A protein has these predicted regions:
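Aromatic-Pro/Gly-enriched surface loop or interdomain linker
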Residues: 187, 191, 198, 202-210, ...
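A short beta-strand element within beta-rich, extracytoplasmic domains
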Residues: 287-311
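Active-site-adjacent mobile loop/cap segments within catalytic or ligand-binding domains
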Residues: 357, 364, 376-384, 471, ...
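Active-site microenvironments of hydrolase-like enzyme catalytic domains
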Residues: 394-399, 412-525, 553-576
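Pro/Thr/Ser/Gly-rich low-complexity, intrinsically disordered linker/stalk tracts
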Residues: 604-647, 681, 695-714
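Beta-strand-rich modules
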Residues: 676-696
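A glycine-rich, often tryptophan-bearing local segment used as a flexible ligand/cofactor-contacting loop or short
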Residues: 837-944, 955-957, 964, 994-995, ...
Length: 1012
């Protein structure tokens, strides 16, 4: 009986099992097909918007009872910038794939536990999520009010406070026992310096020009000198006080610069005292404090003030910075940011102790009996003074004899070291109790943001400096290599969940996705989306039509996770990818990127705070300066239209004036595009112009100068034809590629702080091993602690000094004003054309023609007409002949050879730094004189890697100087119907001022005194 029963059970099993297996396999295969199709569709849609890896881990969660389907996928799905159109396409694809299997089901696609429709940014959505609108509604008085600015920002970033930092910096590695960069030297730079070259010259000034108060957890002044003036310290600098009704009194703990260097956890803001006094509303009762620095070297110095915040601090401490351009006033709200270094601006100071170069503080206020405090004032950036110990037992004071500093400018160091110097608690800058300085550095930045905002309306329960920070922005570049000459591109990162998870799920704790003020941390994703979109869109329209957008990551990065304000971590491009770096090294690209970030921040804050934004204008163009009488000058300029931003139209302009070698004044507002002013003879006047509107101020124009000789001598017109700024020359031969900085290092904007040294590994097949052996792109370190001079756009003054010494008058103009006809060359008997390192330069993939040509066709016509009418012309530049010369032609029938009577010789020769100045012609020096020009990177003047070697093309042309050690001509003069003098190196790069004066005097004597 049992056997029959067993057989029966076996039969039943055999009868039914195969059918069940088939059904299970069928269901499994069907599910795989569906998930595969969904993965294919999502990946295809994603790659129309961003560069995306395959979207895998698709899950189909079916609820048969409710007839709903929830679709989720891996992290890549969340990287999309969701928009109504791509969300509609996603849902359309999902319904198309699933409707046959699951008819009439409602589908919901989710990322991080949220419907993707909810992740359309608020500023693009019809359904606003008010929980993620982060705004400061408190009418806070801004930390700094600039009283001397001749215009007001009403539709920009006024009253906004932004925390900003430029990635990594020099830090001490306990593992290696030395100071190192956090990233390798690649393609002539390191990320630690590369991001700084965006933030300091471009992004920070743009934000401040829009009215924002900017906070950077690193030194922002590239001036390597530093002077501290303090009430506690007796130095050659002076601190003084005056008293009237109220007297200055000793305060509590404050700053004192007691040590040559500081070790962990020393705090210089706990080593001294501060001063305090009551405020007054009466002009007759004013008391003052005065800080007079002993400046070691004339130059631009950042001014930082220190004070303490007390219970009844004043909201309008009146600081006046006296500098070589005049006096600039500020109001500082001392109810916040006490006990640290507050940056006011950069100013020109003279060498030594000068009563015209100082800072004063007055107790005059709108409110009486508030408390005004005064502590140290810092001039300049200086060198790093935070020391470390090579032994891990560095907290033990017995080891302080082994302390060493970085020996680098402070701006090159990481945040950790600046924060210690700036009085920030060691619990902020050293989260690892000084046992891991690498981690301390990157972790400190986010906690510093919270320290800034602690006690303010945005972070009310925390201890801190009470600054109502609106947002934070971390500027990085990334690693990674992309083949086929493609761009790695731009990545945006936020962290929605502050518990350290790599997703937006709150694990049941909604507090994990809220800031301290109760606003949803999803606000950060909206901000990241907007700024990343602005960057990529602008780059596609100006530099590369296929610039890569990588996506929006919601991952746990300390810099994005820790701050209690919306924070973006930007990975702009890959510093390891040659194609990306061809753009990154170009100052114009840096300007475009920085302007895009500024616009993104502006638009984000405009949306969240419900105001109409206006973008600051672009710099003016076609600037000219000419005499209209013996004692008056007319300046003219034209606005620049911004094709990317309709609101960036100027309302008015500001003219800044400098007299002789002083500094620029605070500017005069001008409604039109011209300005007439009276001048005194015997003084050199210099001018620059900026455009302004309700959103802020543009970057300044080039600088033009003019001088009227007291005896009303002939006037020389200086034409500035040197407006080039560019990255270094590059090449790509498939098997070899890179940057040829020894041939043409490019031209920095004002200065360069990113150059470490020449590239020495050119093989793309050379692999990364470690930071000291990074493979393809590896570069030297010769110049990594140098601030390298670039194009200051101020060479009309330098040329003008020599013309003045030769006893002639001069005025100046941009070359564009000559081409446009605003300036008529025929009005002048002699012109001095500055070409510097002007050279045809290709950039980007949207520009079919080169920029910065030495002699564009329209200029050729103007110069030819001028010379044919008996004019006299001096031209100097590193590419004065070679830029226009077509080596494929055997004849000399081109503009340079026919007008200037020179042709270039092969540049691929040895570098010459010395010039022998001598000539047999009576108007030029017969006795030999040796001089040098700048041919290597330096701090004083842009350098010329390869000057032009000249050869005369006319029997009436003759050599006036030659490169030392050979017979190549460095300068050629011509005397015929007109007179011409051509120098194969820029005149302004001659190192010795007396030599410049001598050569200019000889040339002008040749022009004006010799017979035709």
């Amino acid at each position: 009986m049992k056997r029959y029963l067993l057989a029966y059970l076996i039969i039943i099993c055999l009868g039914f099992y195969p059918e069940q297996v088939v059904a299970a396999k069928s269901t499994s295969n069907s599910s795989k097909i569906l998930t595969q199709n969904i993965s294919d569709s999502l990946t295809a849609i994603a790659n129309t918007v961003i560069f995306s890896d395959r979207i895998n881990q698709v899950k189909i969660d079916v609820n048969q009872a409710l007839k709903t389907i929830k679709i989720t996928a891996g992290d890549n799905f969340g990287h999309l910038p969701f928009r109504k159109d791509n969300v509609d396409r996603i849902y359309s694809a999902l319904y198309s794939i699933l409707e046959k299997t699951y008819p009439n089901y409602i589908i919901k696609a989710e990322v991080y536990g949220r419907d993707i429709r909810e992740l359309i940014p608020n500023y693009l959505s019809n359904k606003i999520d008010s929980s993620r609108i982060y705004k400061n509604t408190s009418p806070t008085i801004p930390l700094i009010t600039r009283l001397s600015t001749p215009f007001s920002v009403t539709n920009g970033l006024q009253n906004r406070h932004v925390a900003l930092w430029n990635s990594h910096g020099r830090h001490f590695s306990q593992l290696e026992g030395k100071w190192i960069w956090q990233r390798p030297r690649l393609f002539t730079t390191a990320e630690d310096l590369l991001t700084t070259s965006f933030v300091l010259p471009f992004l920070a000034p743009m934000l401040e020009n829009a009215g924002a108060n900017i906070f950077i957890p690193r030194e922002r002044d590239v001036q390597t000198n530093e002077v501290i003036v303090d009430n506690d310290d007796k130095t050659t600098s002076r601190y003084r006080e005056t008293h009237r009704r109220y007297h200055w009194q000793k305060g509590d703990t404050g700053f004192s610069n007691k040590n040559e260097y500081y070790v962990y956890p020393e705090n210089p803001f706990k080593m001294g005292t501060y001063r305090q006094i009551k405020t007054t509303i009466n002009d007759d009762d004013i008391s003052t404090a005065e800080w007079v620095p002993d400046i070691p070297e004339k130059g631009l110095y950042a001014v930082y003030v220190a004070y303490q915040t007390t219970e009844n601090s004043t909201e309008d401490a009146r600081y006046t910075v006296h500098h070589l351009g005049g006096a600039t006033e500020f109001l500082v709200n001392q109810t916040m940011f006490g006990g640290s270094w507050l940056y006011l601006g950069h100013f020109l100071f003279d060498t030594g102790i000068n009563n015209d170069c100082k800072v004063t503080l007055s107790n005059l206020s709108k409110d009486k009996n508030r408390i005004l405090t005064a502590d140290a004032i810092k001039f300049g950036g200086g060198m790093g003074n935070i020391a470390v110990l090579q032994d891990k037992r560095q907290i033990d004071k017995s080891f302080t004899d082994n302390a060493n500093t970085s020996n680098f400018p402070r701006f090159a160091e990481g945040a950790k070291y600046w924060l210690q110097w700036a009085g920030v608690p060691d619990s902020i800058y050293s989260r690892n109790s000084n046992t891991n300085e690498y981690s301390d550095d990157f972790q400190s930045r986010g906690f510093w943001v919270n320290y800034l905002s602690g006690g303010s309306v945005v972070n009310p329960k925390a201890e801190g400096l009470k600054v109502p920070i609106d947002l934070a922005f971390a500027f990085h570049t990334d690693a990674g290599i992309s083949g086929n000459d493609s761009i790695v591109g731009t990545l945006g990162i936020c962290t929605v969940n502050n518990n350290g998870n790599n997703n937006g799920n709150s694990n049941g704790n909604t507090a994990n996705t809220l800031y301290k003020n109760g606003v949803s941390r999803w606000a950060a994703r909206d901000m990241v989306d907007l700024i990343q979109t602005q960057i990529v869109d602008d780059l596609k329209q100006t530099w590369h039509p296929e610039w890569t957008r990588r996506g929006i990551w919601n991952k746990s990065y300390s810099e994005a996770r820790v701050p209690e304000v919306p924070t973006m971590l930007l990975e702009l491009l890959s510093h390891q990818n040659f194609e990306d770096m061809k753009y990154a090294l170009d100052p114009r690209f840096r300007f475009t990127v920085s302007r895009a970030i500024y616009k993104g921040i502006l638009k984000h804050l405009a949306y969240t705070n419900n105001f109409e934004y206006v973008v600051q204008p672009l710099p003016v163009k076609e600037f000219s300066c000419k005499f209209i009488s013996d004692d008056s000058i007319r300046l003219t300029w034209q606005e620049t239209i911004d094709s990317l931003e309709i609101t960036a139209k100027p309302d008015s302009f500001i003219v800044y004036t400098r007299i002789n070698d002083g500094g620029f004044d605070n500017g005069k507002i001008i409604s039109g595009n011209s300005y007439v002013l009276e001048i005194e003879s015997g003084k050199i006047y210099s001018f620059k112009v900026s455009a302004v509107n309700k959103g802020g101020e543009s970057f300044p124009s080039e600088i033009l100068s003019a001088y009227k000789h007291p005896q009303n001598k002939e006037t020389v017109l200086i034409v500035n034809g040197f407006d080039r700024i560019s990255g270094p020359e590059n090449f790509n031969l498939i098997t070899l590629a890179g940057f040829m900085t020894d041939r043409d290092a490019g031209v920095p904007y004002l200065y360069d702080i990113s150059f470490t040294g020449n590239q020495y590994v050119f093989s793309p097949d050379s692999a990364y091993y470690d930071n000291e052996n990074p493979g393809f792109g590896a570069s030297k370190s010769d110049y990594e602690n140098m601030v390298i001079a670039g194009n200051t756009f101020d060479y009309t003054y330098l040329h003008g000094e020599s013309i003045k010494e030769a006893q002639y008058s001069f005025t100046s103009t941009s070359v564009q004003s000559v081409i446009s006809g605003e300036i008529n060359l025929q009005d002048y008997k002699a012109i001095d054309l500055i070409l510097g390192k002007q050279k045809q330069t290709f950039s980007g993939k949207l520009k079919n023609k080169p920029e910065f040509q030495t002699f564009p066709l329209a200029l050729q016509h103007k110069l030819t007409d001028y010379c044919n009418n008996g004019g006299n012309i001096l031209v100097s530049g590193a590419y004065v002949a070679s830029d226009m010369y077509d080596y494929s032609k055997e004849d000399n029938d081109n503009f340079v050879s026919s007008l200037l009577k020179v042709k270039p010789l092969d540049k691929d020769t040895i570098i010459f730094s010395g010039v022998l100045y001598e000539s047999q012609y009576s108007n030029f020096l017969k006795k030999s004189r040796h001089f040098e020009y700048y041919h290597e990177p330096n701090t004083n003047m842009y350098s010329v890697e390869k000057p032009d070697l000249l050869e005369s093309t006319d029997e009436d042309a003759f050599e006036i100087c030659r490169y030392e050690g050979n017979d190549y001509a460095a300068g050629v003069a011509y005397k015929g119907v007109y007179k011409a003098c051509t120098l194969g190196f820029p005149f302004e790069t001659i190192k010795d001022g007396k030599t410049r004066n001598l050569i200019m005097s000889d040339i002008l004597s040749f022009f004006f005194n010799s017979k035709p």
